[in-house]
Amino acid sequence: LMTGELFEIKDNCLKVVSLDGHRIAIRKMPLKREYSDRKIVVPGKTLSEVLKLLKDSEGEAKICPSRRHILFRIDNYTVISALLEGEFLDYKSALPKDKKTEVTVSTRTMIESVERVSLLITDRLKSPVRCVIGEDTVKLFCTTTMGRATDQISAEISGDQLEIGFNNKYLLDARSEERR
């Protein structure tokens, strides 16, 4: 199922997994009380409505899943939805089993750096943002027919050095999450 998001409760943590065919987003957060382990798939349209309510909310959302439905309580609003039936895609098979490199960097710093090197990218001049991961820095660069942009940021790095390219729009999508 790709029309919904996986909510997985395991070891007193809630993991939410979303896929769009190009990217995987995973968010894991501890739960305040004990729950039995389970997996449910919540429709994407329901979560879009819940997100609208959360943007205007100061408080916490309460999530109450049942066997076939889920209830979200946000401030004075209640959203009830049927759950999707079927198995969520096996996203774990797309994740590397052994990590050879781990990079820890400030989300804001990374986004600002990607924005700077993306100035040369247009709809006509698409080019990946290349990241060269060294000992304690990440060098970002982009080359188009208009020129070359480079930037460098500090990072905590363990493992092998690496060079990898990304679509800048996918990296910049983290902006909305970083602002929360």
Model-predicted segments: where are they?
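DNA polymerase processivity clamps
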Residues: L1-K28, K32-L84, K99-R180
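Bateman (tandem CBS) regulatory domains
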Residues: A94-D98
